[in-house]
Amino acid sequence: MTSSPNNLLEKIRCPNCWHEFPPDQLHFYSTSPEFAFDHVLGAGQQRAFLPSQFTPQGDAIDPGGGICTETACPKCHLRVPRLLAQFPTIAVSIFGSPGSGKSFLIAAMTHTVMQQIVHYGVTAEDADPLLNAIVRDYEKTLFQQASPDATVQLRKTEDVGDWYNKIQQRGRTKTLPKPFLYRIDRFWGNKTATHEGRCLCLYDNAGESFEPGAENEDNPVTRHMAKADTLLFVYDPTQETAFRRACAEKSSDPQWRGQARGDQTALFTEASKRIRDFRSMRPTDKIDTPLIVLLPKFDAWKFLLTDEDLPKPYKEVPVESGASSIRFLDTDILLDISRKCRLLIKKYQPALLAKIEATFNIKKIIFLPVSATGCSPVKESPPEPEQEVVPSLDNLDLGDLDLLSEDPPSNPDGYGHFRAGDINPIWAEMPLLTALKLVAPQFLPRAKK
């Protein structure tokens, strides 16, 4: 996708519905109150329209005379920041099974990248604060608790709800995933940015979205994976029986208790099948998209990989003035850690490794250990036991049926909360930095030897 002489891209790809259109078809949201209805978004939503009048500053004027600054896709009418008319998009899709810790990991990844990327000579900021509001709330929950003794727990990614938008098209309701958008620019050595930036577009996938029948024309919630420039597969060792047996005798971490959950190989197989289907590929074709396999909860199983802390994945090089330094990713360290993680999967889950390497280009697969929290979950003190009331079947009131049908607690052992003061992510910035290195290496050049 190239830029035209007026610094606009030839095509914009909507991050919501993936419709491609020229910049002059970008719609604007009306601001006049009489237009508080949109036939795609529904009642209470300001109408998206193609403007014919503009202010000298380039803002649209709606038919009621309102000045309009917010822009939308001409097809789905969802938000499309004007930035996407100038900056090419780097799309990153993350997927994994329920309980793999994706919610924590996404919050930790975005938070640590925003904190660390400046040391690499790159700036990062929200491309649209409204679109990123969910992730920002997760970050606040994880990293901005008032007390170090506060307990932290995040809601999982649901296959409906706040993580998705609903629109009306052709008399049918369609569900679309919400993207998270970040503007990234190089700046080191310049007083201002080079304006050769990118828009990083991050998608999350609920594990339930890979169940049979979850993906269809009215619910195309995983279709963005076929458009992704990089895929992040969260492979959770704590869900695998072989890993659990290897760790249970050596670790008191509560994440090794209970039964193994899910079938991560089946989920990976289904995700790969969908990508091939969406791209009209043959079942035997290899997917050429870079794949980063993330092994989360590293703090719980690190003794399987190393007896020491992970090394710093970068080199610091002084700048010419000598007053400061800039970081360069140390690809030798990344590849060495990737090799060790690969061997670990080969030892404990060889069938999955064979599936991964048979599906993707082996030269574009990287394995990374990460920990969103850097610590184990804690167990809360149990509440005082209450007198159990068992309704009599002889005079059972219909309202008492709720007592009999109540679902068991999802976390019967009381684990799953984290102490805020113990949270210290490990390599959480590396998935997105590695994705950026693979797709746009000019942002993270190699250090000169």
Q: What is each residue range found by the language model?
A:
Residues 174-231, 239-246:
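Switch II of P-loop NTPase G domains
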